[in-house]
Regions:
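Juxtamembrane "helix exit" motif at the C-terminal ends of alpha-helical transmembrane segments
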Residues: 227-246, 334-349, 365, 395
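Membrane-helix interface and helix-disruption motif detector
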Residues: 82-90, 116-117, 138-146, 216, ...
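Transmembrane alpha-helix boundary signature
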Residues: 52-65, 111-115
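Helix-loop-helix module between adjacent transmembrane segments
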Residues: 87-99, 115, 321-324
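Hydrophobic alpha-helical segments embedded in the membrane of multi-pass proteins
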Residues: 95-104, 122-133, 150-155, 331, ...
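Helix-loop-helix junctions within the multi-pass membrane cores of secondary transporters/permeases
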Residues: 16-21, 34, 59, 63-84, ...
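Signature of multi-pass transmembrane helix bundles
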Residues: 1-51, 96, 100, 104-298, ...
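Membrane-proximal extracellular juxtamembrane segment immediately upstream
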Residues: 51-55, 349-352, 372, 381, ...
Length: 461
C-alpha cells in the first residue's frame, strides 16, 4: 500500500503514467511513447524542483526576515505543517481515502458533466488527510470513513476545476486543459472581481514600459529586480533598524550565513527568487507540450472529453506580469487582513491572527492575479489579487476554531478550498454522526451524476 501511495502522491510519476497510458491507447510508436513519457516526468520534476527551491529558499527566508523585521506574532497557514501532524495519527485512513478518491474522480468524470481528472498529487494527499481528520470526529471509522472521505475527495476534485474552467479557457485559449489546485474558490472569486472591470482595463501584459526600462518586459529581470528591492528593504529593517547594525552579517537569522553581509545576502536571495520562477516556467512548458496530446488517448477511450487538471504554475507563462503583480498585491492584502483581524480581536471577539505566509501568497496570489487579469485586465488583477489576499487571511481564521476542536491548535490550512471544506464539513461532522454523516457524503457524491441523468443536455447548434 505504501508503494502505491508513494506513486499516487508523486505528481511526476503519476502524470508520467497518465502520459504513458494515453500514448499507448493512441497506439503511438514506441519511440514516441518513451519520449512523451520521459519529457512529461522531467517537466514535472523541473517544476517541482523550482517550487521546492522557492519554498525552502527565498520564500522561507523572506518570511523569517519579514516577521522579525516587523515583530509579527501569530499563525502562518501552512498545508505541509498541518498535514504532517495529521498523518501521525491518520496515515492509513489518508492512504485509503486517497486511493478511493482518485477512483471516485474518474467515476464522476465519466458519468457526470464535470469531465476533469485531477492530477495534482500532493494536493490530493493534503485533502485526504484533512478529510480523514474531520470525518473521524464524526464517529466514522474503517471502511465507512474511507468510502465517505474518498467520495467527498472525488467530488472536490471535479468541482474545483469546474469553478475555474471558464476563466481557464480564456487564459490558455483552449478547452483541452483543466486547472487542478485546491485554491479554486479563491481563483474563481478573483475572476469574478475581475469581471467588474471588463472592457475597462488593458491586460497586465500590455503595460507599455518606457524604452529605457523596456528590460522590465523580461519576466526574469522584472521579478529579479522587484524581489531584490523587497529583500533589501526588509533585511535593512531587520538588521539595521531593529538590531542597530550590531552584526552586519545575516548570522543572527540564518546560522549557515555567518560570513555573508546582509546586503549581499539580500541581493542574492532576490535574484534567486527569479531563478526559481524561471525553473518553474521551464517545467510547465515541458509538461504542456506532452501531457495534453497524450491525454487525448484517455479521453477518447475511457472518459470522453476529459480534461487533465494541472497544478497552478501551469498558468504562469500566460501572464508573467500578472504573476508578479498578483503575488505582491495579494501579500499586501494579507498584511491589511492581519490588521483587520487584530482590530476585531481587540474590539469584538477573540480571533486567530493570521500572518501573511509568503508561500501561499506567492502561489495562490500569483494565480489569482492571472485569473483576475484574464477577466478584468490590469485593474481587475490589482483589485482581484488584493481581495484574494484578504480572503485567504479571513478563511483560515474562520477555519481555526474547527481545527482547534480537532486538537490542531495553532495550525490551519492556507488555500481557499481546504478552508471552505474544513469549515463546512467540520461543522456538519459536529452535529451529524456515524451513519448519518456517511449518508450525507454518499448523497453529495451522487448529485452530479443524478443531475446528468435527469436534466436535459443543451443541444449543439
Amino acid at each position: 500500500m505504501s508503494f502505491i501511495i508513494n506513486i499516487l502522491s508523486t505528481p511526476a510519476i503519476l502524470v508520467g503514467l497518465i502520459s504513458l497510458f494515453g500514448l499507448i491507447l493512441q497506439k503511438k510508436p514506441v519511440e514516441d511513447v518513451v519520449k512523451g513519457t520521459v519529457k512529461t516526468i522531467v517537466g514535472f520534476l523541473v517544476l517541482t524542483a523550482g517550487s521546492s527551491f522557492l519554498q525552502t529558499g527565498p520564500l522561507n527566508d523572506f518570511g523569517v526576515i519579514f516577521n522579525y523585521a516587523f515583530n509579527m506574532q501569530g499563525v502562518v497557514p501552512n498545508n505541509e505543517a498541518i498535514v504532517s501532524l495529521g498523518l501521525a495519527d491518520f496515515a492509513s485512513d489518508t492512504a485509503y481515502i486517497m486511493c478511493i478518491g482518485m477512483i471516485a474522480n474518474i467515476v464522476l468524470a465519466r458519468f457526470s458533466r464535470l469531465h476533469y481528472i485531477f492530477l495534482t498529487g500532493h494536493h490530493t494527499l493534503y485533502m485526504s488527510a484533512m478529510l480523514a481528520i474531520i470525518l473521524n470526529v464524526g464517529n466514522l471509522t474503517g471502511p465507512m470513513l474511507w468510502i465517505s472521505g474518498g467520495l467527498i475527495l472525488g467530488l472536490i476534485m471535479v468541482i474545483s476545476p469546474a469553478l475555474c474552467q471558464p476563466t481557464m479557457e480564456k487564459i490558455t485559449g483552449t478547452d483541452e486543459l483543466g486547472f487542478g489546485h485546491f485554491g479554486g474558490f479563491g481563483y474563481w472569486f478573483s475572476a469574478q472581481i475581475g469581471k467588474l472591470f471588463k472592457d475597462k482595463s488593458k491586460s497586465t501584459e500590455d503595460v507599455n514600459f518606457p524604452q529605457r526600462i523596456s528590460f522590465l518586459r523580461d519576466t526574469t529581470v522584472a521579478i529579479g529586480l522587484t524581489m531584490t528591492i523587497f529583500f533589501v528593504v526588509v533585511t535593512f529593517v531587520a538588521v539595521v533598524v531593529r538590531d542597530g547594525m550590531s552584526d552586519p552579517t545575516i548570522s543572527a537569522f540564518f546560522k549557515g550565513e555567518t560570513q555573508t553581509h546582509w546586503i549581499v545576502w539580500a541581493i542574492t536571495k532576490g535574484l534567486s527568487f527569479a531563478g526559481g520562477v524561471y525553473i518553474i516556467l521551464s517545467g510547465v512548458r515541458l509538461i504542456i507540450g506532452e501531457i495534453v496530446p497524450a491525454f487525448r488517448g484517455i479521453a477518447e477511450k475511457i472518459v470522453p472529453n476529459a480534461k487533465p487538471a494541472i497544478d497552478c504554475p501551469v498558468v504562469f507563462p500566460y501572464a508573467p506580469n500578472a504573476v508578479l503583480m498578483g503575488f505582491l498585491v495579494s501579500f499586501l492584502g494579507g498584511i491589511v487582513g492581519l490588521f483587520v483581524l487584530g482590530g476585531i480581536n481587540k474590539a469584538l471577539i477573540p480571533v486567530a491572527l493570521i500572518l501573511p505566509g509568503v508561500i501561499p501568497h506567492f502561489f495562490c496570489g500569483a494565480t489569482a492575479g492571472v485569473f483576475a487579469n484574464a477577466e478584468g485586465g490590469l485593474k481587475g488583477c490589482l483589485v482581484g489579487s488584493f481581495l484574494h489576499g484578504l480572503l485567504i487571511t479571513f478563511l483560515p481564521a474562520i477555519c481555526m476554531p474547527v481545527m482547534g476542536s480537532l486538537n490542531f491548535a495553532n495550525c490551519t490550512f492556507s488555500d481557499a478550498d481546504f478552508s471552505i471544506t474544513g469549515i463546512i464539513l467540520g461543522n456538519i461532522a459536529q452535529f451529524v454522526k456515524g451513519g448519518g454523516l456517511f449518508a450525507v457524503c454518499v448523497v453529495l457524491f451522487l448529485l452530479p451524476i443524478i443531475y446528468n441523468v435527469i436534466m436535459p443536455k443543451k443541444k449543439e447548434a
